[in-house]
């Protein structure tokens, strides 16, 4: 190999290595940039989930109070300790018959979680422990409460049907909504207190209310643990 040829070989070899090195560096920089973008997305996911959970704090506290109040009224009926005075003290602008014929709903904000599932961002969360706890709060514990509420709702519908079938004259007076008619409300309570069939329905209802309250406590504990983990 003459000097001129050797010179070209060295030149092109160096150029080749420069090109390869440039491509490698470019890929490295691109990978670093992508990883940084993913880290920023993960941080945003954590921050948004934390904000959503903390925004529900007041709602969860209020729901616990509502669960306990409704339970207290049904329990009072079954123990024959529900007085007309207590009936009057039921929360303003709401029917005191609600504990017996309706169900307290449970609708904490879930939009961030649902969005993460829909766009696949949930898979960006790396920690298996964190993902499992998020699923516990947003799926397992949440669905447990919802399923119990649905069962309780069926009993509430049966209680309403009881009055349709057995006390249609009072039912047609729309007693559930005419709660300002004290005489009508008291007559409904007298039926409820003295009818064993209706009380049997309330035994069913209060059993679901007890389980529901316990499920909400479990939900709250898991939720608090999730908030603590997200803040780390």
PLM regions and their residue ranges:
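Hydrophobic membrane-insertion alpha-helices, especially the h-region
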Residues: 13-27
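Long, hydrophobic alpha-helical segments that serve as membrane-spanning/inserting helices
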Residues: 1-6, 10, 31-232
